[in-house]
Amino acid sequence: YVQKAEQIIEQFEADGADLIFGLTHLHLASDIEIAKLKRRHPMFKFIVGGHEHEVQRHSGDANTADVMKGASNARTIWQIDVTFSAGGTEVSSQQIDIDQSIAIDPEYQVIADKWRGKLLELVPFFASRIGYAATPLDGREASVRNGDSNWGGFIADQMRTAFRDPPADLAFINGGTLRIDDFVADDITFEDIGRTFGFS
């Protein structure tokens, strides 16, 4: 990755870029290796990365670009402010948690409602109830990727009972397949299944 990143940085430098940053989806260790390119390319200021799914920051210095990663499912973001002046470029960043304390922008809500309506036109059963959870089912990433969870157990039970002839004795599923990263409570809907198997 480092060699390819340096080729791209050199191209941006040749094009006269005022600032260069990386947008990646790599392991933190790989991002840190790429960040060291700042030593030879001082216009390379920061990397915004993904992959780990947890908020992370590796602070840079004169020879290393900053590396910032937000949480999965847009639960945390980094606000990055860049100031250009005759004296150079200044970059500052702030971690922002996206939670109930932030009001939903009405203009955004109109757009979200429009697209949800289009989804329901294409898949009218998406909001349909397929079951009921008397106990909240834990589909959070921290649970399904680190041990047994009742949501993972529920999914595996559905898989096992789907095979009747011959009957399956057991079923298991890789926790990384379960992408909902949330609790499922009360009505279980097709939407919950769609959010769980986001890549299907």
Model-derived features: positions:
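Active-site-proximal beta-strand/loop segments in catalytic clefts of secreted hydrolases
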Residues: 23-27, 50-53, 70-73, 159, ...
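Conserved beta-sheet core of the metallophosphoesterase superfamily
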Residues: 30-84
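Short acidic, glycine-rich surface-loop motifs adjacent to enzyme active sites
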Residues: 5-31
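Gly/Ser/Thr-rich active-site loops/lids in small-molecule metabolic enzymes
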Residues: 1-4, 74, 193-199
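Short, Asp-centered acidic motifs that coordinate Mg2+ and/or phosphate
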Residues: 18-21, 45-46, 66, 170
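Soluble non-cytosolic domains of exported or imported proteins
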Residues: 2-3, 28-29, 73, 146-153
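Solvent-exposed loop/linker segments at secondary-structure transitions
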Residues: 13, 32, 36, 46, ...
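Generic structural signal for well-ordered alpha-helices
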Residues: 2-10, 77, 156
